[in-house]
Swiss-Prot record:
Family as reported in the entry's similarity comment: Belongs to the WTF family.
Tagged with keyword Zinc-finger: no
Organism: Schizosaccharomyces pombe (strain 972 / ATCC 24843)
Membrane protein topology class: Multi-pass membrane protein
Protein name: Meiotic drive suppressor wtf18
Transmembrane regions listed in the UniProt entry: 86-106, 120-140, 153-173, 197-217, 233-253, 257-277
Amino acid sequence: MKNNYTSLKSPLDEEDELKTDHEIDLEKGLLPEYNSEEEGTLPLYSDISKLANPVPEDSSTGPTEIANPNVERRQEFKDSHPNIYFLLRLLISVLAVSVVFFTAWVCVNPLEKSIFGKVAFSVTIGITCPILFIATFCFFETWTQAVAQCIKVTVIFLAQCVKVTVIFLAQCVKVTAVFLAKCVKVIAVGLYNSKKDLVVTIWLAWVVICFILFGCVKDGRLNLNKALICSTCSISAALFFILLLVCIPIWTLKHMLFGLFQVLGVQSCVVIVTKGLMYLFDKHIDATGYEIEASSLFVIGNFLFFYEMECPGALKRMPKFIRNGIASFLEGIGNAFGGIGNAIGRIGNAFRGANDNNNNIPLEETEAESEV
């Protein structure tokens, strides 16, 4: 049998239903897609609006802002324990006034008999202390927030300073270690490539001569003066000259003489600067001072000569290396002063932010408090 089912709805009613199915509410937006597999009915428009706007809005203040947890805890403590909060403010205000009072008492007490002392003490007691008490008690939240921000910024700045200092020292240690490692490598390679027996013989002769010279100085039979300094440097340079000429023939005579004169020039500059500084400060070098100077020049001369032989042009590049080191040091100082300036700016922003937070009180809350 055929199902002769006829709809009781008129054609106009069917057209209205088709229109309402495809119409969209502009205020509520599109309907969510319906999953036929899941049980349940379609969500209501009220649920959709809650999901779309999870943050509640207030008609007067707009969207709520994320509050500071410290401020919230302070407000909760203030609301739950108003008497304790009042006593705390009063105690801190009295302590601040007491510190100022006793400071003025200690400082002005010696001048108590003079007119200036009496006026200063009267002004401190009559004007400064009441103003300080009122400011501390009434603006307790403002200045405590400012102090907290100041402490936070100071701690961050000190941590950054420590971090920069540690990094700078680590870089200095790294550069020094690399430089010393290269020097040791150069010396080791040079000694390894030379004849071992001759190296040991010349080295022992060099050490014996050094001990004889310094032993004579200790006994007083030899006055250590400029001649001894020059002779010590010359003997050391000559010994290395013979060693390098015999053992390592790749180093030409011209190159060795050029390096020797460069080293003597550096030593002469060191001696001139030392003598000039001693003359400027009206100091005289005794035997110990001459001994230290001779030992330093002895070691420096041999080291520079050997380094110049292994790395030709090293002495010419040394001023550039020194300039780069000084520039890096000055750059670090400039960065440190820049960090100090940024810290001062952050402290100012902290005070400004604390004042803005204190002034940003809604108008309706102030009106409600006035009505109460």
